[in-house]
């Protein structure tokens, strides 16, 4: 399939939030629900799960390089990452749905991405004991990144100004529901399902090489130190931001004049957005929402 297939992606207007299975969603991720729900996972599938804007593309690219970087290097220059790692629940008019792309992947293992909260992940992934790589990012930076993403992506609801968006974020009125429930849901699942690797965006920024090693160890991959180093260099933020195959510049519904898909990739950028009052309110809400969990985040390095 050619890259140009995505240029026929059609959107008439920004979607409205809808309530779906108890969380906020948009129809682009629910219109194909029967097929998503009944998706047939395989034992060697690798599901990359994150809340939006938490490092999905980064981990997708690392995994793609680990598995296919050597055996089919042409993938890296001819196919954008969203074709190599299909977005399972996506169904936009004019392009193949995520389930169809995943079903037709020629590779093994199949790398598949989702933003679904844990309770909505197709049950065949658990039944087949597929491996799941979850990436979590601290709530403050995640909120900032999501705000800029919503501004530039016409496939997302209108975000309003920063303060409006932040209030919605704290209330969990974002596409894919509350951040708090998302990160906690997968953290809890990890206690009963051993095939989840729970990663933190902040750890990846701090030491990408170390986290690539953790991935290899979880996936049972034996890669040489030289190979891991080559991959670590290739997935640095600035390299990916310039790379047409990873920066989403080939998707017409994203307006890069407003904000690039890959903006800063830093830890602590929230300090440039939160006022003192917003920060105090956010901390208060955070304490309430996260009081029954052991998962801990770093908001700066």
UniProtKB/Swiss-Prot annotation:
Describe the pH profile of activity: Optimum pH is about 5.0 with n-propyl gallate as substrate, and another smaller pH optimum is observed spanning pH 9.5-10.5. Optimum pH is 10.5 with dopamine as substrate.
Kindly report, in one word, the top-level EC class recorded for this enzyme. Answer: transferase
Question: Mind telling me what this protein is named?
Answer: Cytosolic sulfotransferase 3
Q: Where is the active site?
A: 115
What does it do? Sulfotransferase that utilizes 3'-phospho-5'-adenylyl sulfate (PAPS) as sulfonate donor to catalyze the sulfate conjugation of a variety of xenobiotic and endogenous compounds, including dopamine, T3 (triiodo-L-thyronine), T4 (thyroxine), estrone, DHEA (dehydroepiandrosterone), flavonoids, isoflavonoids and other phenolic compounds.
Answer yes or no on keyword Cytoplasm. Answer: yes
**Which family does the similarity line name?**
Belongs to the sulfotransferase 1 family.
Q: Where is this gene product found?
A: Cytoplasm
Q: Gene Ontology cellular component?
A: cytoplasm
> What GO molecular function terms would the record report?
aryl sulfotransferase activity; sulfotransferase activity
Reading the lineage from the top rank, the first entry is Eukaryota
Q: Which UniProt keywords apply?
A: Catecholamine metabolism, Cytoplasm, Lipid metabolism, Steroid metabolism, Transferase
State the encoding gene: sult1st3
């Amino acid at each position: 399939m050619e890259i140009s297939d995505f240029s026929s992606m059609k959107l008439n207007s920004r979607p409205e939030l809808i309530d779906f299975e108890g969380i906020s969603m948009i129809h682009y991720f629910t219109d194909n629900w029967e097929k998503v729900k009944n998706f047939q996972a395989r034992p060697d599938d690798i599901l990359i799960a994150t809340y939006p804007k938490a490092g999905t593309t980064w981990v997708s690219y690392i995994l793609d390089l680990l598995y296919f970087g050597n055996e089919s290097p042409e993938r890296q220059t001819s196919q954008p990452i969203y074709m190599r790692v299909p977005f399972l629940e996506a169904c936009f008019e004019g392009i193949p749905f995520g389930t169809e792309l995943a079903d037709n992947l020629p590779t093994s293992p199949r790398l598949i991405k989702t933003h679904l909260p844990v309770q909505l992940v197709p049950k065949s992934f658990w039944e087949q004991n597929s491996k799941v790589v979850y990436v979590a990012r601290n709530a403050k930076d995640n909120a900032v990144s999501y705000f800029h993403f919503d501004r530039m992506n016409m496939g997302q609801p209108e975000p309003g100004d920063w303060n409006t968006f932040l209030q919605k974020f704290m209330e969990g009125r974002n596409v894919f529901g509350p951040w708090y429930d998302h990160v906690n849901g997968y953290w809890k699942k990890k206690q009963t399902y051993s095939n989840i690797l729970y990663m933190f965006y902040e750890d990846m920024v701090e030491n990408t090489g170390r986290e690539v090693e953790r991935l290899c160890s979880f996936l049972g991959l034996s890669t040489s130190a030289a190979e891991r180093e080559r991959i670590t260099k290739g997935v640095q933020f600035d390299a990916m931001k310039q790379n047409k195959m990873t920066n989403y510049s080939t998707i017409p519904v994203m307006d890069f004049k407003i904000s690039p898909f890959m903006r800063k990739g830093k830890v602590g950028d929230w300090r440039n957005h939160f006022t003192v009052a917003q920060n105090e309110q956010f901390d208060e809400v955070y304490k309430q929402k996260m009081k029954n969990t052991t998962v801990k985040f770093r908001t700066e390095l």
